[in-house]
C-alpha cells in the first residue's frame, strides 16, 4: 500500500514498529487496495520508489515462501497495468497535461520499471521509516470539476492556430485607425450640430424676450395711460422743476407710491383684456396683481412727470450651453461628495433587490475563481488549497460577523469601524433631514421598523469629504441587503429631522429640485437725473433707489442680459452696472458679442455723448474693483492680463509697461498694453507696410506651406522660429506706386494687390468687365488682374481676383472696344442660333417628305382612297356608320403583308423604260433606290 500524506503535503517519520502491527496493516491494505487507488487524488508526478515497493509487497502474503516468485511476477504485471491506467486517467482529467513537456511523458512511462528494480532493496526500510496517516477527502466541488472534464468532452476537431503576419497587422491597425477617426468625426459633427441648435434656440428666445419688452414699453407710453397716471400724482411732486428732481426726490416719490399702491394676488386677470385695459383697471383701484404690473404703473407715473425713464429688463433665456454636460458633472459630484449616493439610488430600483452583490463579495468570487484555475493547473497535487476552500465562508456571513463585532465593542475605534463596515448610522444621522438628500437605508435581516429610519443623535464628528468618499464606496452597498424602510416613515423622518448634510449630493434631479427657487424681480426702472447727469436705478417693489447691488440681489440668477428701453424705443445694454461678475463668468454665458451688438445696432440711441459718459462710468466702476486673486480669472479678462495667457501673435508693448500688481508672483499688466502682432504680408492686407530698419518684435514658427517645406528640407531648422512679427507702431501706411508711360506697376507675381481701395496705383483705374484682357491684348494696352484677397481651400491658398487694373487714359478706349467686341460676339451668336434653327427645320421637312413617300409606296391605299373615289364628303350619320368598316379594313391591311404589289402596278413597272425610271428616281435618297 502506498504511503499516505498529511493535509499539509509532508510525510511524517516514525521509529521501529512491531511485527504484529505490520501484519495487521498489510492484511487491511490487501482488502482496500483498489478502493484506496480510486479515492486518493491523482498526482501528476511519479510515485516514490519506496511507496512503489511497498504497494507491490502489500499485495502478497509474507508467510507463503513457495508462491513468492509467482506472486511477484503477477504483482509486477498488475502494478504496471495499474500505473499505466492511472497515467492515462491523469492525462485525461488534468487540464494542464496538454501543455506538459515531452520529458515529463517519458518520465511517466519509465516509472514502472524503476519501481520493480528498487523493490527488493527498500521494502524493509519503507515499512519502518514511514507512518500511515488518515488522508483528508477532497471537496465535492473539485470532484465535480474532475468529472466535468471527461474524455467525452474533449474536442474532436483539430485545433487551428492562426498567426497574424506583419502585413495583416498593419492592415488591421490601419482599418481600426480609420474606423476610430470616422467615429471621432461623427461625434464631433454631432456635438457641433447640437451646439449650433442650442445657440440658435438661445438667440431666438433672447429676441422673443426683447420683443416682449418692446411691446410693454410701447404700452407704457400711451397718452391715455399717461393722463390717468398724472391725475393720481399729488401736487407737491408736480410743482418741483425738472432740474431739481434728484435722487432725494425719487426716494420721496417711491415712498408715496409704496404707501398708495398694494399688491393683491387675488385680483382677477382676464385673457381677453390687453395690457392697456388691465393697467387702467389697476390704477383705478390703486392695486396691482403682481410685481410686473406694479413696475408698469410706476413707469407711467414717472413718464407722466416728464422724467427720462428706462424700463430695465433682466432677460432670462434658455442656457447658451446644453444641460447635458451639467448633468454629467452633477453625476460626478454625486459619486464623489455623497459616498452613499450610488447605493441609495440603486436600492430604489427593482434590480438592486434581486442583486445584492457587494464589492467584497465580488473580490472574493474573483479570488475563488483564481484559486480554482490554479488548482486545475497544478493537477490537484496538494490538499492545502482544498482545505482553505472548505474553511472559506460566504461574503454575507463575513459582513454579518463584522457587524456583530461592531455591536459587541461600540467604544473601541468606533469611527473607523463604522466608516468601514456600515454607513447606515452616518446616513441616518446626517442625511435624513431632506427628501432630496436622504434615501431609506436597509436594516439587518427582516427587523426594519419606523424607528430605524428616524434620525438619531449624532455621537461622533462627521469625517472629512475624502474619508467619507472612501468609506462610502466600501460600505454603502452593504446596506442594501436588508429590507427597505416603509414608505410611510420616510416623510416623517425627512420632515422631523433638521441636521441634513449640505455638502451631500444624491442626483442631478435632486440638485435641480434644490435649485428651483421662486423667481425674483427681473424688471425695474432707471431715471436720468439732470443734477447728477447720470442714470439712477429705482426698484419700486422693495423701495430701493440708487442701489444696483440691491437690484442684483433681488433678481433671478444668473443675470446675463440686462437691457434698458427708454420712451423713444432706444435700447441700451446695462448689464455691467448690475452684475458684479461681468468681467469673469457672465461674459462666458453670453452669446457672441458681435452678434449681440449687431442686433442692438438699429435701436442705438442718437445721444452719443450721454452714452460715452455712461461707458466711462462703467469703466471707472470696473477699475475700482480689486485685482482678481485667481490666475484663471485673468484669462481673457477685459482689464488685466498675465504673460502666461498671451497668445502666439500677442505681446506686451512697451516692454517697460507699468505693473499694476502681482498675482502669486506674476506681474499683472493692463489689457491696453497687450497688442496683436502680424507678419509683413498680413500688414500689407491692411494697407500698411513695415518701416525700413525695423527689427521683428517677436519671432515665431511659421506654418505656411513654404515654411514647412523649408523645415523639412533642413532638419536643423525644425525648431527654428522663422516668422518675424511686427507691431502697429512699427508700420506705416502703404504708398501705392505710380503708373508711368501707360504701364501698370506690378508686384513680384505680375499682379496688383488691391486689398483696400487706397492701394490703387496712382493714375490707374479698376474695370470689372469680363474678358477685358483679350480686348486690351488686341489693342496692345497694358492690363493687369486685381487681387482683392485670398481663399483657403483644398489645403492651399488661392488668390481672389476682381476685375482688371488699367491706366486711366485708356479707360474710354477699352470701354468702347469692349462694347464693340460684345456686339460682334452677340451678332455671331445670333447668326449661329439662326443657322442652327434653319438646319433643324430643313431636317424636319426632309424627314416629313420621306415619311409621305414611304406611305405612298408601302402604305395601304385602298381604304384611304375609297372615300375620295366616291366623290364628295359623307354626312355625320354616314361617317358614324362607316367608321367600323374603315377600322376593320385598316386592321386587315395592317395584318396582311405589305410587300406584295398589285398585278396592275407590276405590269406598269414592266412597261416603263429605263430612262423614265431613272428620271423618277432622281429625287430619291441612295437608300431609297435599293
Swiss-Prot record:
GO MF terms held by the record: damaged DNA binding; DNA damage sensor activity; protein-containing complex binding; RNA polymerase II-specific DNA-binding transcription factor binding; single-stranded DNA binding; transcription coactivator activity
Motif (Nuclear localization signal): 388-393
Record's compositionally biased regions (Basic residues): 40-57, 408-418
Subcellular location: Nucleus; Chromosome; Cytoplasm
Assembly and interaction partners: Component of the XPC complex composed of XPC, RAD23B and CETN2. Interacts with RAD23A; the interaction is suggesting the existence of a functional equivalent variant XPC complex. Interacts with TDG; the interaction is demonstrated using the XPC:RAD23B dimer. Interacts with SMUG1; the interaction is demonstrated using the XPC:RAD23B dimer. Interacts with DDB2. Interacts with CCNH, GTF2H1 and ERCC3. Interacts with E2F1 and KAT2A; leading to KAT2A recruitment to promoters and subsequent acetylation of histones.
Function per UniProt: Involved in global genome nucleotide excision repair (GG-NER) by acting as damage sensing and DNA-binding factor component of the XPC complex. Has only a low DNA repair activity by itself which is stimulated by RAD23B and RAD23A. Has a preference to bind DNA containing a short single-stranded segment but not to damaged oligonucleotides.
Name the UniProt record assigns to this protein: DNA repair protein complementing XP-C cells homolog
Organism annotation: Mus musculus (Mouse)
Amino acid at each position: 500500500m502506498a504511503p499516505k500524506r498529511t493535509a499539509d503535503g509532508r510525510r511524517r517519520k516514525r521509529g521501529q514498529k512491531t511485527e504484529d502491527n505490520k501484519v495487521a496493516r498489510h492484511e487491511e491494505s490487501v482488502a482496500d487496495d483498489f478502493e484506496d487507488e480510486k479515492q486518493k487524488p491523482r498526482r501528476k508526478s511519479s510515485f516514490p520508489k519506496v511507496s512503489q515497493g511497498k504497494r507491490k509487497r502489500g499485495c502478497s502474503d509474507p508467510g507463503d515462501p513457495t508462491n513468492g516468485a509467482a506472486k511477484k511476477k503477477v504483482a509486477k504485471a498488475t502494478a504496471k497495468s495499474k500505473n499505466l491506467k492511472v497515467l492515462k486517467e491523469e492525462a485525461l482529467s488534468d487540464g494542464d497535461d496538454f501543455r506538459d513537456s515531452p520529458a515529463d511523458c517519458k518520465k511517466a512511462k519509465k516509472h514502472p520499471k524503476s519501481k520493480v528494480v528498487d523493490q527488493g532493496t527498500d521494502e524493509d526500510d519503507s515499512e519502518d521509516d514511514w507512518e500511515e496517516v488518515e488522508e483528508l477527502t477532497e471537496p465535492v466541488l473539485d470532484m465535480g470539476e474532475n468529472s466535468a472534464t471527461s474524455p467525452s468532452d474533449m474536442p474532436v476537431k483539430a485545433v487551428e492556430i492562426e498567426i497574424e503576419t506583419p502585413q495583416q497587422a498593419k492592415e488591421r491597425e490601419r482599418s481600426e485607425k480609420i474606423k476610430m477617426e470616422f467615429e471621432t468625426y461623427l461625434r464631433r459633427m454631432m456635438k457641433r450640430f447640437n451646439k449650433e441648435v442650442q445657440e440658435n434656440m438661445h438667440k431666438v428666445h433672447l429676441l422673443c424676450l426683447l420683443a416682449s419688452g418692446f411691446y410693454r414699453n410701447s404700452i407704457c407710453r400711451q397718452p391715455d395711460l399717461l393722463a390717468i397716471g398724472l391725475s393720481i400724482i399729488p401736487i407737491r411732486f408736480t410743482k418741483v422743476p425738472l432740474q431739481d428732481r434728484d435722487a432725494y426726490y425719487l426716494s420721496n416719490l417711491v415712498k408715496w407710491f409704496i404707501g398708495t399702491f398694494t399688491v393683491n394676488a387675488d385680483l382677477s386677470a382676464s385673457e381677453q383684456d390687453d395690457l392697456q385695459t388691465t393697467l387702467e383697471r389697476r390704477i383705478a383701484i390703486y392695486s396691482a396683481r403682481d410685481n410686473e404690473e406694479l413696475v408698469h404703473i410706476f413707469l407711467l407715473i414717472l413718464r407722466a412727470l416728464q422724467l427720462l425713464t428706462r424700463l430695465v429688463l433682466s432677460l432670462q433665456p434658455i442656457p447658451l450651453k446644453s444641460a447635458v454636460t451639467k448633468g454629467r458633472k452633477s453625476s460626478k459630484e454625486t459619486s464623489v461628495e455623497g459616498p452613499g449616493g450610488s447605493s441609495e439610488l440603486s436600492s430604489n430600483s427593482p434590480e438592486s433587490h434581486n442583486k445584492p452583490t457587494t464589492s467584497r463579495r465580488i473580490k472574493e468570487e474573483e479570488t475563488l475563481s483564481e484559486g480554482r484555475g490554479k488548482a486545475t493547473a497544478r493537477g490537484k497535487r496538494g490538499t492545502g488549497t482544498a482545505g482553505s476552500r472548505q474553511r472559506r465562508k460566504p461574503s454575507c456571513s463575513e459582513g454579518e460577523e463584522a457587524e456583530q463585532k461592531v455591536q459587541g465593542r461600540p467604544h473601541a475605534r468606533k469611527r473607523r469601524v463604522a466608516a468601514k463596515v456600515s454607513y447606515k448610522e452616518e446616513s441616518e444621522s446626517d442625511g435624513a433631514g431632506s427628501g432630496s438628500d436622504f434615501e431609506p437605508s436597509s436594516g439587518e435581516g427582516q427587523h426594519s421598523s419606523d424607528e430605524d429610519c428616524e434620525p438619531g443623535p449624532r455621537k461622533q464628528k462627521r469625517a472629512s469629504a475624502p474619508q467619507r468618499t472612501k468609506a462610502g464606496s466600501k460600505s454603502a452597498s452593504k446596506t442594501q441587503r436588508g429590507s427597505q424602510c416603509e414608505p410611510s416613515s420616510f416623510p416623517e423622518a425627512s420632515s422631523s429631522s433638521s441636521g441634513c448634510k449640505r455638502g451631500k449630493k444624491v442626483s442631478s434631479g435632486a440638485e435641480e429640485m434644490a435649485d428651483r427657487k421662486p423667481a425674483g424681480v427681473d424688471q425695474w426702472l432707471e431715471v436720468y437725473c439732470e443734477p447728477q447727469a447720470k442714470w439712477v436705478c429705482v426698484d419700486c417693489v422693495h423701495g430701493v433707489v440708487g442701489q444696483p447691488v440691491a437690484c442684483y440681489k433681488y433678481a433671478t440668477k444668473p443675470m446675463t442680459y440686462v437691457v434698458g428701453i427708454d420712451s423713444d424705443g432706444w435700447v441700451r445694454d446695462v448689464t455691467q452696472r448690475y452684475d458684479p461678475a461681468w468681467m469673469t463668468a457672465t461674459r462666458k454665458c453670453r452669446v457672441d458679442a458681435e452678434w449681440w451688438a449687431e442686433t442692438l445696432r438699429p435701436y442705438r440711441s442718437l445721444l452719443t455723448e450721454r452714452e460715452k459718459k455712461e461707458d466711462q462710468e462703467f469703466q471707472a466702476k470696473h477699475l475700482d474693483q480689486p485685482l482678481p486673486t485667481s490666475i484663471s480669472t485673468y484669462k481673457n479678462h477685459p482689464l488685466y492680463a498675465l504673460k502666461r495667457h498671451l497668445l502666439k501673435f500677442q505681446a506686451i508693448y512697451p516692454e517697460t509697461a507699468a505693473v499694476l500688481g502681482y498675482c502669486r508672483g506674476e506681474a499683472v499688466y493692463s489689457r491696453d498694453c497687450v497688442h496683436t502682432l502680424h507678419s509683413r504680408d498680413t500688414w500689407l492686407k491692411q494697407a500698411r507696410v513695415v518701416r525700413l530698419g525695423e527689427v521683428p518684435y517677436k519671432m515665431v514658427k511659421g506654418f505656411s506651406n513654404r515654411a514647412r517645406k523649408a523645415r523639412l528640407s533642413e532638419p536643423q531648422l525644425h525648431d527654428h522660429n522663422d516668422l518675424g512679427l511686427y507691431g502697429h507702431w512699427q508700420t506705416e501706411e502703404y504708398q501705392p506706386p505710380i503708373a508711368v508711360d501707360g504701364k501698370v506697376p506690378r508686384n513680384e507675381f505680375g499682379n496688383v494687390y488691391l486689398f483696400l481701395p487706397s492701394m490703387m496705383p496712382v493714375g490707374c483705374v479698376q474695370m470689372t468687365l469680363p474678358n477685358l484682357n483679350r480686348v486690351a491684348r488686341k489693342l496692345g494696352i497694358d492690363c493687369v488682374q486685381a487681387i482683392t484677397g485670398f481663399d483657403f481651400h483644398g489645403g492651399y491658398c488661392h488668390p481672389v481676383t476682381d476685375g482688371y487694373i488699367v491706366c486711366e487714359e485708356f479707360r474710354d478706349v477699352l470701354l468702347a472696344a469692349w462694347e464693340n467686341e460684345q456686339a460682334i460676339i452677340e451678332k455671331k451668336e445670333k447668326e449661329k442660333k439662326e443657322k442652327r434653327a434653319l438646319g433643324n427645320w430643313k431636317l424636319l421637312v426632309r424627314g416629313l417628305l420621306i415619311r409621305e413617300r414611304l406611305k405612298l409606296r408601302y402604305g395601304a391605299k385602298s381604304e384611304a382612297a375609297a372615300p375620295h373615289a366616291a366623290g364628295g364628303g359623307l354626312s355625320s350619320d354616314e361617317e358614324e356608320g362607316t367608321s367600323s368598316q374603315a377600322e376593320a379594313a385598316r386592321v386587315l391591311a395592317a395584318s396582311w403583308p405589305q410587300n406584295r404589289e398589285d398585278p396592275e402596278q407590276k405590269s406598269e413597272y414592266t412597261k416603263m423604260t429605263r430612262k423614265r425610271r431613272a428620271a423618277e428616281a432622281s429625287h430619291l435618297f441612295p437608300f431609297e433606290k435599293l
